[in-house]
Every structure is written in C-alpha cells, then in structure tokens.
C-alpha cells in the first residue's frame, strides 16, 4: 500500500520537495500552512477512515506489527494511538442496564461469571481475567485482571453494576473463592453438566480467537500490564456495543 505524503499539521497534500534532512530523508514544504516535514510514516496524516480501520483491526487477532504492515503506519504512531483508544474506553463498558421494576429484575436477571488464564511478558507471569456476563443480553457487565485469589473475586464483584449485585442470580463453576464473595442467595455453583456457564465460556473462546495477545502460544503477547488490560477493555466495550445494538429500544 502506497500512502501519499500529507502535511501532519493540516493534512494537505499540496506540498513540494524541499531538500533532505541531515539523515538523508526527503524533506517537504507544505504550500498551505508553510510547515516543513519529512516523509516518515509517523508524519503522514492519518484520516478518520484509516483510524476506524485500525480500530477494527485491533479486534481481529492481528499483531501490532501486522497492522503496521497492512495499513502503512509506523509502530511508534500505532503505539501512541492504541494508548489513546484504550484510555477512551468508559468504565461502564457500554453496558445497557435493564429497564423495569425490581419485581421484574429479581425473576429475570441471570448472570454468569468465570475466570480465564492469560500472561504478560512471560507465561510465569500469569494474569487471570475475571468476567461477568448478562446471560440474556450477552453483555459483559464487569471484568477484572489479577491473580486467581479471593481478592480478585471481590474486585470483580465490586465492578458488577449494582442492579445485578442486588437482583441477579449468578451461575459460576465450583471454584471455592466465589463462595462468600457472591451472596449465597444470589449464587448458584454448578457442574459442567449443568451447562449454566456456557455463554461466558463461549465468550472466553471469542477473546482468544479475536485478541492475538490472548492466544496461548503467541509471539504477540503483552509486554505491559496496562496495555494488556486496555486491549481487553477495548474489545469488551465494542463487543457490548454490538450486543446492545441488537436489543429492543
């Protein structure tokens, strides 16, 4: 893919060659804003359409360097861009909360919770993803990344929206740490045969299929915990938007 040199300040393509930099790279002069710039990938103007394309690729199991090759941006620019994308994700994860009365919620709200293994830098540095899902709408209502302790279970429970904590019935596997964290009247621990956590387990598979850094044997693993959490949150926020778009208004 060939990208024309555009002014990084105004985006204009009305430029002319203006000698070379001390490193031998072609220098350009913008006729519109009169700024000088060199034809490096990080100085190319990235349109809104191209940025939207990159956001989609971030959710399609493609490594960062693969995105650079496919779209024609520099790794330096892409790293700055993903930090901005991750920072823009809302803490509420774009969850659409249920409407209606408490009398309806207490009978209809069903949720599932599960945990999933991942790592940062090396497999010895385990990072467990704790997830909670609305079993009806398939929205991910909360997540937490940490160890596999009771404290992480508490962190997940604290992140669950209040309406679910107060009224939903939560199905989990029989991992002991859930007991005492999720109130007994709201919690049902089940066996595999009960198939009450199928939806959240299927979402775990979706994560591994769609995020390259979560593949068990991958060269695209996370190097920083902040980006690891950010990538997961970024995917969940967009996933929830897709799910809420299918819900009745």
Where are these predicted regions, by residue range?
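Residue-level recognition of single "structural anchor" positions
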Residues: 1-249
């Amino acid at each position: 893919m060939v990208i024309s040199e555009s002014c990084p300040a105004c985006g204009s393509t009305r430029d002319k060659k203006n000698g070379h930099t001390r490193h031998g790279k072609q220098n350009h002069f913008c006729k519109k804003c009169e700024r000088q710039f060199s034809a490096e990938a990080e100085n190319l103007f990235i349109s809104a359409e191209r940025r939207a394309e990159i956001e989609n690729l971030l959710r399609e199991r493609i490594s960062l360097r693969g995105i650079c090759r496919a779209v024609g941006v520099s790794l330096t620019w892409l790293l700055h861009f993903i930090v901005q994308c991750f920072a823009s994700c809302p803490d509420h994860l774009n969850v659409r909360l249920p409407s209606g009365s408490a009398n309806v919620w207490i009978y209809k709200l069903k949720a599932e919770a599960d945990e999933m293994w991942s790592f940062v830098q090396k497999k010895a540095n385990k990072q467990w993803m704790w997830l909670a899902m609305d079993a009806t709408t398939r929205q991910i209502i909360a997540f937490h990344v940490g160890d596999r302790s009771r404290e992480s279970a508490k962190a997940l429970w604290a992140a669950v929206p209040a309406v679910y904590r107060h009224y939903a019935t939560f199905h989990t596997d029989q991992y002991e740490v859930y007991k005492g964290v999720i109130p007994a009247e709201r919690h049902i621990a089940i066996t595999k045969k009960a198939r009450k956590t199928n939806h959240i387990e299927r979402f775990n598979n979706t994560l591994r299929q769609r995020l390259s850094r979560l593949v068990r044997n991958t060269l695209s693993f996370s190097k920083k915990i902040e980006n690891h959490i950010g990538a997961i949150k970024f995917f969940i926020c967009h996933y929830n938007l897709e799910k809420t778009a299918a819900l009745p208004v």
